[in-house]
Amino acid sequence: MAPTIRKSHPLLKIINGSFIDLPSPANISAWWNFGSLLGVCLIAQIATGLFLAMHHTADTSLAFSSIAHICRDVNNGWLLRNLHANGASFFFICIYFHIGRGLYYGSYLYKETWNIGVILLFLVMATAFVGYVLPWGQMSFWGATVITNLLSAAPYIGPDLVQWIWGGFSVDNATLTRFFTFHFILPFIIAAASMINLLFLHQTGSSNPTGLNSNLDKVSFHPYFSYKDLLGFVIMLGALASLSTFAPNLLGDPDNFTPANPLVTPPHIKPEWYFLFAYAILRSIPNKLGGVLALLLSIMILFLMPIIHTSKLRSLMFRPIAKTFFWALIANTAILTWIGGQPVEDPFITIGQIASGLYFLIFVLLIPSLGLLENKLLKI
């Protein structure tokens, strides 16, 4: 009998092995949907971004008015712009759920997949940051100024590094042009890195909620999980469409409706909501270099997860003590997000410092020590 084309064709058999006949654990829950949802987010962002780039002008004198032009004069431009801006928020919601799932169920023990994932997080954060500068509103300009200025904390090369990034002595036309370039190219780098992420994942297969070996109980990805993922797509795209049409500016900053003005500083400079937890950690340290290092470490600490895993059990499903502290970490991150949006005054400064300390304490001290404690309890 002639082999099926999807199994014999050089290109189709790669797709078949990744999305059709892929053996998947039968017991994976909806928490495993977020990987494919991230793929949908990326495709949606590239599609809407491509059309927006056709009408956007990366020039300080025209950028702000080109956004107004897109919203007023371009066919469905308002929808494209709102889908793209809110799509970024949904992208980060999916990323944070995806990372949370990985931490809870021990997915980080697939080291290569996890490390590529953390690199992807950095790339997505960089893309979102440079993209936020493009409308050239007040918060775009001052956000770019504040965040790029952090590089000046680097010893010896700091000031030169900042001027090199700026392309001059301040955030100006050269900065906007290069940020547009970065914002255009980075999503394609993210797409390539996502494929590497999938490649590594398919070497080992997916983990599952129990953290046990699931080779005895696997089903094909299609039709079971393709339809399960499809439900996730409908829910997410429905929520994105609803937010983009009914409350498109809910997550934005009102300051960004004012054109960038280097002579007027906004009363509270803050990034988009998805960066607030890291921004709170940055602000909680009075020293500039210390703050920058803490900011970097708040994400880079994820690289340590495979090293600090001391438990004999993979998943938190059977680890009641560690489970409690996982949710404490989630609550703590939520508190940091809230603090990041507050002005720098008491009691917010103190709360931010305590929450930042706890954030690192849970990762560096509690996760490894609780693993060892639970190992001892298993022997009793």
Swiss-Prot record:
<comment type="subunit">
    <text>The cytochrome bc1 complex contains 3 respiratory subunits (MT-CYB, CYC1 and UQCRFS1), 2 core proteins (UQCRC1 and UQCRC2) and probably 6 low-molecular weight proteins.</text>
</comment>
<dbReference type="InterPro" id="IPR005798">
    <property type="entry name" value="Cyt_b/b6_C"/>
</dbReference>
<keyword id="KW-0479">Metal-binding</keyword>
<dbReference type="Pfam" id="PF00033">
    <property type="entry name" value="Cytochrome_B"/>
</dbReference>
<dbReference type="InterPro" id="IPR048259">
    <property type="entry name" value="Cytochrome_b_N_euk/bac"/>
</dbReference>
<feature type="binding site" description="axial binding residue">
    <location>
        <position position="183"/>
    </location>
    <ligand>
        <name>heme b b562</name>
    </ligand>
</feature>
<keyword id="KW-0813">Transport</keyword>
<dbReference type="InterPro" id="IPR005797">
    <property type="entry name" value="Cyt_b/b6_N"/>
</dbReference>
<feature type="transmembrane region" description="Helical">
    <location>
        <begin position="289"/>
        <end position="309"/>
    </location>
</feature>
<dbReference type="GO" id="GO:0045275">
    <property type="term" value="C:respiratory chain complex III"/>
</dbReference>
<comment type="function">
    <text>Component of the ubiquinol-cytochrome c reductase complex (complex III or cytochrome b-c1 complex) that is part of the mitochondrial respiratory chain. The b-c1 complex mediates electron transfer from ubiquinol to cytochrome c. Contributes to the generation of a proton gradient across the mitochondrial membrane that is then used for ATP synthesis.</text>
</comment>
<keyword id="KW-0249">Electron transport</keyword>
<feature type="binding site" description="axial binding residue">
    <location>
        <position position="84"/>
    </location>
    <ligand>
        <name>heme b b562</name>
    </ligand>
</feature>
<keyword id="KW-0812">Transmembrane</keyword>
<feature type="binding site">
    <location>
        <position position="202"/>
    </location>
    <ligand>
        <name>a ubiquinone</name>
    </ligand>
</feature>
<keyword id="KW-0349">Heme</keyword>
<feature type="transmembrane region" description="Helical">
    <location>
        <begin position="321"/>
        <end position="341"/>
    </location>
</feature>
<protein>
    <recommendedName>
        <fullName>Cytochrome b</fullName>
    </recommendedName>
</protein>
<dbReference type="InterPro" id="IPR030689">
    <property type="entry name" value="Cytochrome_b"/>
</dbReference>
<dbReference type="Pfam" id="PF00032">
    <property type="entry name" value="Cytochrom_B_C"/>
</dbReference>
<dbReference type="GO" id="GO:0006122">
    <property type="term" value="P:mitochondrial electron transport, ubiquinol to cytochrome c"/>
</dbReference>
<keyword id="KW-0999">Mitochondrion inner membrane</keyword>
<dbReference type="InterPro" id="IPR048260">
    <property type="entry name" value="Cytochrome_b_C_euk/bac"/>
</dbReference>
<feature type="transmembrane region" description="Helical">
    <location>
        <begin position="348"/>
        <end position="368"/>
    </location>
</feature>
<feature type="transmembrane region" description="Helical">
    <location>
        <begin position="179"/>
        <end position="199"/>
    </location>
</feature>
<feature type="binding site" description="axial binding residue">
    <location>
        <position position="98"/>
    </location>
    <ligand>
        <name>heme b b566</name>
    </ligand>
</feature>
<keyword id="KW-1133">Transmembrane helix</keyword>
<feature type="transmembrane region" description="Helical">
    <location>
        <begin position="78"/>
        <end position="99"/>
    </location>
</feature>
<feature type="transmembrane region" description="Helical">
    <location>
        <begin position="227"/>
        <end position="247"/>
    </location>
</feature>
<dbReference type="InterPro" id="IPR036150">
    <property type="entry name" value="Cyt_b/b6_C_sf"/>
</dbReference>
<feature type="transmembrane region" description="Helical">
    <location>
        <begin position="34"/>
        <end position="54"/>
    </location>
</feature>
<dbReference type="InterPro" id="IPR016174">
    <property type="entry name" value="Di-haem_cyt_TM"/>
</dbReference>
<keyword id="KW-0830">Ubiquinone</keyword>
<dbReference type="InterPro" id="IPR027387">
    <property type="entry name" value="Cytb/b6-like_sf"/>
</dbReference>
<keyword id="KW-0408">Iron</keyword>
<comment type="similarity">
    <text>Belongs to the cytochrome b family.</text>
</comment>
<dbReference type="GO" id="GO:0046872">
    <property type="term" value="F:metal ion binding"/>
</dbReference>
<dbReference type="GO" id="GO:0008121">
    <property type="term" value="F:ubiquinol-cytochrome-c reductase activity"/>
</dbReference>
<dbReference type="GO" id="GO:0005743">
    <property type="term" value="C:mitochondrial inner membrane"/>
</dbReference>
<keyword id="KW-0679">Respiratory chain</keyword>
<keyword id="KW-0472">Membrane</keyword>
<feature type="transmembrane region" description="Helical">
    <location>
        <begin position="114"/>
        <end position="134"/>
    </location>
</feature>
